[in-house]
Amino acid sequence: MDSTVFINNPSLTLPFSYTFTSSSNSSTTTSTTTDSSSGQWMDGRIWSKLPPPLLDRVIAFLPPPAFFRTRCVCKRFYSLLFSNTFLETYLQLLPLRHNCFLFFKHKTLKSYIYKRGGTNDDDSNKAEGFLFDPNEIRWYRLSFAYIPSGFYPSGSSGGLVSWVSEEAGLKTILLCNPLVGSVSQLPPISRPRLFPSIGLSVTPTSIDVTVAGDDLISPYAVKNLSSESFHVDAGGFFSLWAMTSSLPRLCSLESGKMVYVQGKFYCMNYSPFSVLSYEVTGNRWIKIQAPMRRFLRSPSLLESKGRLILVAAVEKSKLNVPKSLRLWSLQQDNATWVEIERMPQPLYTQFAAEEGGKGFECVGNQEFVMIVLRGTSLQLLFDIVRKSWLWVPPCPYSGSGGGSSGGGSDGEVLQGFAYDPVLTTPVVSLLDQLTLPFPGVC
């Protein structure tokens, strides 16, 4: 992981350095662990006798950025990422989730020109992702050079990022762990599609994928007719792209976006706005009416602490209601929406001026909601728990100027996913017995 940050770029420090305060002659002084006589960071008489298993348990609780800085300390720390003993300890401890967002510069679907036997020629933007840590307000850069050309990112879950083949037909899906550079392939889907909506749910013991819509009924026509699902778990049960129930009539999906919440996949439906829900265990699709559906603009679905959240701008031109950006939560009856937050009006006035009617994208992870303004380099971070709004410093790695970072030039957008970095994802080993290695993937 690139440890360069956009703001408050600190010098690299050892992860176990610390300070303490002591009193002497009624004056308070602060001392560090540095030994002035030996020049060492820590007292070797203490730390050299600390049992390695105990030290490994401490390291296992470090946030991913701190863990990768720790690997620079010595050869043993560097090798922890490849140590089965350490990784088993890491999985047993289940450290607290480090909620992040992962962004990619990605072309909009309208900018793709499909050619039989070929794919999009511009793959430069797909070689890297931009990791944003909302806890520290820092940007990092991740390399995805090991992903073959002709694939685009489609989702993230359980520390894995999914990539889907661009070429129309029987789609191939790859799952990768960006922290270790591992790649696993799912079997090809069973029905030819163009740009379907794809949902991903990964737990420590199972993988679920749902692919819906954009059925190729001819080389030149698509319809939203069907969906198919993939499941594999540690209990030995697997289902390879079983055709599920048909999609609701006259649905218009937003290709590529699905959200998983408590056993269901959700995606936006257009013209008019509504929400489609697929219950995995019940194998059925239902349509949920969206709140204020005739007055919504740029609606997005996201997951927050086990709840489905709808974020959208509300514009009622013929009514005496101020324009605003609102958040609704879907209740347990799977039909009722409750407004949980509204952007303060002074902030919305500034937001609307910067957004300029070009639209925006939203992605959520636990208590954080990230709003990306199209055609600009601006992002707005909302903390649901603290009820705080913050303009985020632009990503320093995504190109100069506002157009390329937020979208607008050459049909590019900054596409984001909720991402929880983890050091190991042993569940992908379940795929080894199902597929052969993908050509060109190590």
Swiss-Prot record:
Gene: UFO
Role summary: Component of SCF(ASK-cullin-F-box) E3 ubiquitin ligase complexes, which may mediate the ubiquitination and subsequent proteasomal degradation of target proteins. Considered as a meristem identity factor required for normal growth of the young floral meristem. Acts together with LEAFY to positively regulate the B class floral homeotic genes APETALA3 and PISTILLATA. In this way, operates as a region-specific regulator for petal and stamen development. Alternatively, may play a role as a negative regulator of the C class floral homeotic genes.
Subunit structure, interactors included: Part of a putative SCF (ASK/Cullin/F-box) ubiquitin ligase complex. Interacts with SKP1A/ASK1, SKP1B/ASK2 and ASK11.
Region (Interaction with SKP1A): 1-85
Keywords: Activator, Developmental protein, Differentiation, Flowering, Nucleus, Transcription, Transcription regulation, Ubl conjugation pathway
GO BP term, pick one: regulation of DNA-templated transcription
Gene Ontology molecular function terms on file: ubiquitin-protein transferase activity
Entry's localization field: Nucleus
GO annotations of cellular component type: nucleus
Pfam families: Beta-prop_KIB1-4 (PF03478), F-box (PF00646)
Domain notes: The F-box is necessary for the interaction with ASK proteins.
Gene3D superfamilies: 1.20.1280.50, Kelch-type beta propeller
Miscellaneous field: Mutations in the UFO gene result in the formation of unusual floral organs.
The organism's taxonomic lineage, starting at the top: Eukaryota, Viridiplantae, Streptophyta, Embryophyta, Tracheophyta
Metabolic or biological pathway: Protein modification; protein ubiquitination
Span of domain F-box: 44-90
Protein name: Protein UNUSUAL FLORAL ORGANS
